[in-house]
UniProtKB/Swiss-Prot annotation:
Organismal lineage: Eukaryota, Fungi, Dikarya, Ascomycota, Saccharomycotina
Protein's recorded name: Phosphoribomutase
Cofactor note: Binds 1 Mg(2+) ion per subunit.
Protein's job: Major phosphoribomutase that converts ribose 1-phosphate to ribose 5-phosphate. Involved in ribose salvage via the pentose phosphate pathway.
Location (main, coarse): cytoplasm
Source organism: Saccharomyces cerevisiae (strain ATCC 204508 / S288c) (Baker's yeast)
Amino acid sequence: MLQGILETVPSDLKDPISLWFKQDRNPKTIEEVTALCKKSDWNELHKRFDSRIQFGTAGLRSQMQAGFSRMNTLVVIQASQGLATYVRQQFPDNLVAVVGHDHRFHSKEFARATAAAFLLKGFKVHYLNPDHEFVHTPLVPFAVDKLKASVGVMITASHNPKMDNGYKVYYSNGCQIIPPHDHAISDSIDANLEPWANVWDFDDVLNKALKQGKLMYSREEMLKLYLEEVSKNLVEINPLKLEVKAKPWFVYTPMHGVGFDIFSTIVKKTLCLVEGKDYLCVPEQQNPDPSFPTVGFPNPEEKGALDIGINLAEKHDIDLLVANDPDADRFSVAVKDMQSGEWRQLTGNEIGFLFAFYEYQKYKSMDKEFQHVHPLAMLNSTVSSQMIKKMAEIEGFHYEDTLTGFKWIGNRAILLEKKGYYVPFGFEEAIGYMFPAMEHDKDGISASIVFLQAYCKWKIDHNLDPLNVLENGFKKYGVFKEYNGYYVVPNPTVTKDIFDYIRNVYTPEGASYPSSIGEEIEVLYYRDLTTGYQSDTINHKPTLPVDPTSQMITVSARPSNGSENEHIRFTIRGSGTEPKLKVYIEACANEEQRASFLAKLTWNVLRREWFRPDEMNIVTKF
């Protein structure tokens, strides 16, 4: 039958499709490819077979479909074989792996296939998902740390749409992988594409390993330890002080994800908060549901994603909503403005400042000897707000920025800790918050615990809500306002063309960078991490890692007609996984209206001078 099908396949597709039929043993994906061949849907087959899904620092992520460029059981097996082989070479005396999964379609199957590959390579596997249980993503890096494993894999696509899934990798230090490991793992995957003997029989492999003591179901052990670590490291307020009102005082939504069970358990056992009495959970979004029925895009940042929760809060006269994304590694907040009566969802940068301010307050109350031995340090990604940099300058603590992603934030935090710094917090503007006392990756559950305490402390001790605290921060450190968005590009070559235009056409001949952008913006600082140039360093070498394969430029500037204390900073970069050119703009001024104006002005000037959407056929999105 297959031979007859292959006879109809175009020559440039015949080899990869033949290989697929040879290697795949999943009846559903075999039938999927067969059906596409019978329909002669060569365009779709080219999309799925012309290239192989690339393993990067975020692991793998794509739609769940048949094909070498998609997420499916065969691709997961191949990735796991390559990863297990590489890690075995790096840690031959510590063959211990952690595997977990969320509630998405096929997550359990992918996780079991992953565990089987590691078991066949001689690893002991701590499997976090007995039966039909789910775990939140932060439990995997936490377990890697506590179990001293050499690698961890979490099957999740975080807040992506329902048709997606992913394969997230943590290295032996509990952080996401960074170069050169990502490239080496990718090479190892390419060298281990042929499925190993018995790897497709993953249920049998797991059952045999369980009897031999090589497969351990470690979910309950790790959850117990996670709870203990939250209590020890993150809880500092007397739970009795959380009796803010005699009725529920906040709403929680897990966004159809895995968050509710772990959230409700943690807040009850550490903060004595009980659902129904102290808070309400959005009933329509409470249970894990991989179809995400109430939201098309299950990301708390998306417009309208929190509407159901806000409506519930309004109904019960509640003025605080906290949210996790589906795998509970991100955290978001909406608060009711008591002056206007309108609800306001805080940006990732605003929440980041509130956490940083709270952690700074805690640090200042610590023992002076501890402060002397362990100076304070906080960090965020280079596309995130510079407000904590300003706070660090004024308050006298150490601040650093990193490349985008917690793979960089987490690894840098570890290095700072080794130097003796106390690093309580790091963040990224995409609602990701890291508390290194728990793990060196973002954690939405830890963020929830810390934020609820901060909220109560400010409310009870100072009669301030988060908006008041933010306003006080603006008064002391300057008003910081962002204007972020992206352009949808038709293909990666357009992104390169735009950056080449900036470097080679817009920049005057003989200059390293443009001194101005239009008549409105005066450039003060310029960094190009693609070419390896930074304007304010010796020999103009960047302080952050250079990557010639990705496009990224950061500019600090001032408005040409502005005052000395007005400042603009923006980063433009090409997305490594999506057809997007991302733009992150932040302006600082004395007044909120002026800062917002400068941020939007910068967007418009860049649009006109650099991006030229009509000419380049790119579309604006926010």
